[in-house]
UniProtKB/Swiss-Prot annotation:
Binding residue positions for Mg(2+): N191, D205
GO molecular function per UniProt: ATP binding; magnesium ion binding; succinate-CoA ligase (ADP-forming) activity; succinate-CoA ligase (GDP-forming) activity
Biological role: Succinyl-CoA synthetase functions in the citric acid cycle (TCA), coupling the hydrolysis of succinyl-CoA to the synthesis of either ATP or GTP and thus represents the only step of substrate-level phosphorylation in the TCA. The beta subunit provides nucleotide specificity of the enzyme and binds the substrate succinate, while the binding sites for coenzyme A and phosphate are found in the alpha subunit.
GO cellular component: cytosol; succinate-CoA ligase complex
Subunit structure: Heterotetramer of two alpha and two beta subunits.
Name listed for the protein in its UniProt record: Succinate--CoA ligase [ADP-forming] subunit beta
């Protein structure tokens, strides 16, 4: 999960990383109020999860309150690379003597943590890495030993930071490592990490990516979720612990197991070529449980997608037997009632398949068609979706 800058700075403050004072707002009046509270020149900064804010006019220096208000008016609603600005960070402007770069990230290729540091900050680090790779130091970090002050100082030295700020930089670098580890981050980046005329070190910007797989031990991270930017169907699925990804097709898909669902996407896409080019509408994996509640939650998500014209339920009975799946489908349709208004093509195979098919046949729901093979089911689902377009 990528964070907004203001959220990254909340984590920085939690771990005593020095930053400039400021608050977030979503109104022009709020920006003016914050600027008045600070009582000094401020930076008005667009809060979007994309780079290039400054070049796009999303970061403005404001010498006084009136300038802050005018800049807030100009930035709110601005489109930056497809991201509309809905929030602003109004922060105290800092005197800058020099700009550096520091980050911690997970190096998947080498299966280790990596620190990157450079005396050349304030610019796109990708440009520095390409045009002057020697200016960007890359230091592997032992996951067990971590980063103490001595190692943090060696990171700053490798990045060729000036000797007079090494101690102050080491303190900040060590605290950024603390953010990285204690918050279960995949990336912690500060660009620029600035030196003030008084040789103070400040994190003027911040980029943090959190590991969503660690959410179970980070209950506070739920507050960082950007619900405005997340598809409402994906939010509903997440609330019900369903693995769901919305796609752009017309055939809704429910399966048990990621491999089976991905295979189902392929066969539906292939079948769709014969039926007007219809495509899969989603990826939805209900995992090992196919109870009536789980099936109802899954169908509720898919049937609320206006693009979906038919639903393909593809289940291989293993630990969860096919009769349990069939009972889940029947129960789900009863639970949903009139909301279940699109045809379902069901393919069952595996443990207790005959009993599962018997249960569905006995229920005789007018929306349900039971098909024997995966290819036949995909073809039928694509045909029904095309007919309903």
């Amino acid at each position: 999960m990528d964070l907004f800058e203001y959220q990254a700075k909340e984590l920085f403050a939690k771990h005593e990383v020095p930053t400039s004072a400021g608050r977030v707002t979503d109104t022009v009046a709020g920006a003016r109020e914050i600027a008045e509270e600070i009582g000094k020149p401020v930076m008005v900064k667009a809060q979007v999860k994309v780079g290039g804010r400054g070049k796009a006019g999303g970061v403005k220096y404001s010498a006084d309150v009136d300038a802050a208000q005018a800049n807030a008016e100009a930035i709110l609603g601005l489109d930056i690379k497809g991201h509309v600005v809905k929030k602003l960070l109004v922060a105290e402007a800092s005197d800058i003597a020099e700009e550096y770069y520091i980050s911690f990230l997970l190096d998947r290729t080498n299966r280790t943590y990596l620190a990157m540091c450079s005396v050349e900050g304030g610019v796109e680090i990708e440009v520095t890495a390409e045009e002057n790779p020697d200016a960007l130091a890359k230091i592997p970090v032992d996951a067990v030993k971590g980063v103490d002050l001595a190692f943090a100082r060696s990171i700053a030295e490798a990045g060729k930071l000036p000797a007079e700020v090494l101690d102050a930089a080491a303190v900040t670098i060590q605290k950024l490592w603390e953010v990285f580890i204690k918050e279960d981050a995949l990336l912690v980046e500060v660009n620029p990490l600035v030196r003030t005329p008084n040789d103070e070190i400040l994190a003027l910007d911040g980029k943090v990516t959190l590991d969503e797989n660690a959410a179970f031990r980070q209950p506070g991270h739920e507050a960082f979720e950007d619900k405005d930017a997340t598809d409402p169907l994906e939010l509903k699925a997440k609330e019900n612990d369903l693995n769901y990804v919305k796609l752009d097709g017309e055939v809704g898909i429910i399966g048990n197991g990621a491999g089976l669902v991905m295979s189902t996407l392929d066969v539906v896409a292939y079948a769709g070529e014969k039926h007007g080019g219809v495509k899969p509408a989603n990826f939805l994996d209900i995992g090992g449980g196919a109870s009536a509640e789980v099936m109802a939650n899954g169908l509720d998500v898919i049937l609320n997608d206006a693009q979906v014209k038919s639903v393909f339920v593809n289940v291989f009975g293993g630990i969860t037997a096919c009769d349990a799946v069939a009972n889940g489908i029947v129960g789900a349709l009863k639970t949903l009632g009139d909301e279940a208004n699109k045809p379902l093509v069901v393919r069952l195979d595996g443990n207790n398949v005959e009993e599962g098919r018997r249960i569905l046949a006995e229920a005789a729901h007018p929306l349900v068609t039971v098909v024997g093979t995966m290819d036949e089911a995909a073809d039928k689902a694509a045909e029904l979706a095309f007919a309903a377009k």
